[in-house]
């Protein structure tokens, strides 16, 4: 929702302040395939293994999202 940086539905998430729905100090992310322990995973980290003739999808190092590269192997 507007103004939220993270999903504050679960107080168990160590990256997100459940009271404010904001990332905790020092956290870059709270969830996502490219988020590990509140930090963006390194560029090139495989976040989705290829199926068929597609190449693996990899993290950008700048986001918690795992973008589809759309490239054939």
From Swiss-Prot:
Keyword Iron assigned: no
Show the Pfam families listed in the entry. Disintegrin
Which InterPro entries does the annotation name?
Disintegrin_CS (IPR018358), Disintegrin_dom (IPR001762), Disintegrin_dom_sf (IPR036436)
Under the heading SUPFAM superfamilies, the entry gives: Blood coagulation inhibitor (disintegrin)
Q: Which Gene3D superfamilies match?
A: Disintegrin domain
Tissue expression remark: Expressed by the venom gland.
Q: What region holds the Disintegrin domain?
A: 1-73
What subcellular compartments does it reside in? Secreted
Give the superkingdom in one word.
Eukaryota
Molecular function (GO) terms for this protein are:
toxin activity
Which pairs are disulfide-linked?
Answer: 6-21, 8-16, 15-38, 29-35, 34-59, 47-66
Keywords of this protein's UniProt record, alphabetized? Answer: Cell adhesion impairing toxin, Disulfide bond, Hemostasis impairing toxin, Platelet aggregation inhibiting toxin, Secreted, Toxin
Sequence motif Cell attachment site, location on chain: 51-53
Q: What Gene Ontology cellular component terms go with this record?
A: extracellular region; plasma membrane
Q: How does it assemble?
A: Monomer (disintegrin).
* PANTHER family referenced in this protein's UniProt entry, alphabetically: ADAM A DISINTEGRIN AND METALLOPROTEASE DOMAIN (PTHR11905), DISINTEGRIN AND METALLOPROTEINASE DOMAIN-CONTAINING PROTEIN 28 (PTHR11905:SF32)
Additional record remark: The disintegrin belongs to the medium disintegrin subfamily.
Task: Tell me the function of this protein.
Answer: Inhibits fibrinogen interaction with platelets. Acts by binding to alpha-IIb/beta-3 (ITGA2B/ITGB3) on the platelet surface and inhibits aggregation induced by ADP, thrombin, platelet-activating factor and collagen.
Tell me the protein family, please.
Belongs to the venom metalloproteinase (M12B) family. P-II subfamily. P-IIa sub-subfamily.
Query: This protein is called what?
Result: Disintegrin tergeminin
> Lineage of the source organism?
Eukaryota, Metazoa, Chordata, Craniata, Vertebrata
């Amino acid at each position: 929702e507007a103004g939220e940086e993270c999903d504050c539905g679960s107080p168990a998430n160590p990256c997100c302040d459940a009271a404010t729905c904001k990332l905790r100090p020092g956290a870059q992310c709270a969830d996502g395939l490219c988020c590990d322990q509140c930090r963006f995973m390194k560029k090139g980290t495989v976040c989705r293994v290829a199926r068929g003739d597609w190449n693996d999808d990899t993290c950008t190092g700048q986001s918690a999202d795992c973008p589809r590269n759309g490239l054939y192997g």
